[in-house]
């Protein structure tokens, strides 16, 4: 109960600030970069022990949304530049050839899994508007909450006993239904009352399914990473939630797939 209370307090403090960052494209870029500094540092720290080197790689990770959002039009351009920079830095600083591979592997995973995936919020915002970008974010919060309490009450069928023993099919179904209800209410307020375009009713189920499935596998994947490194949490950034990576693990899979779903249903979204 104390842990749940801590989680609620932390969320109550952090959530309003995060939502406010969606008021402009530039503030969203700043938010993504700030999150990448924390989550990227946590992930890279699991593999790299050299403190100065870790900071350099984290700076590269945080630069991606700035370069992609403000300088380059294609996402692969800054991605390639940052990857090559990281490889060259490793070749210069790592004395042991075997360490070069470990360093580049860790940096590559962080660059794709954390940086590239989270930065999909930028094209979602740019192509489909702030309301839909915020919907993607808040829907993961709703899914996590509904899945947690439903699983706590009715959870019987374990999805991944090896990596995430407490995650149940019943919890996922509860989270899915929660997202459907939330998306309906979100559209009712944002679209019908505020006259801001949000995904249409026919898109609710594909979107809710995307959130439920991708959030679940995002969480399982991060659990597998933590088991590999023998840690319970990725960090201690957010009291009650663990590290920043623990908080956004599902979101990292949800954001890119949601963008693809929106692209496929672009006529519906617009």
Curated annotation (Swiss-Prot):
The chain crosses the membrane at residues 17-37, 55-75, 81-101, 104-124, 129-149, 170-190, 193-213, 248-268. One of its GO terms (molecular function) is phosphatidate cytidylyltransferase activity. The keyword Iron does not apply. Its EC number is 2.7.7.41. It comes from the Bacteria. It is a multi-pass membrane protein. Keywords: Cell membrane, Lipid biosynthesis, Lipid metabolism, Membrane, Nucleotidyltransferase, Phospholipid biosynthesis, Phospholipid metabolism, Transferase, Transmembrane, Transmembrane helix. The keyword Ligase does not apply. GO terms for cellular component: plasma membrane. Pathway: Phospholipid metabolism; CDP-diacylglycerol biosynthesis; CDP-diacylglycerol from sn-glycerol 3-phosphate: step 3/3. GO terms for biological process: CDP-diacylglycerol biosynthetic process. Signal peptide: none annotated. It is found in: Cell membrane. It catalyses: a 1,2-diacyl-sn-glycero-3-phosphate + CTP + H(+) = a CDP-1,2-diacyl-sn-glycerol + diphosphate. Belongs to the CDS family. This is Phosphatidate cytidylyltransferase. It comes from Thermotoga maritima (strain ATCC 43589 / DSM 3109 / JCM 10099 / NBRC 100826 / MSB8). The lineage of its organism: Bacteria, Thermotogati, Thermotogota, Thermotogae, Thermotogales. The gene is cdsA.
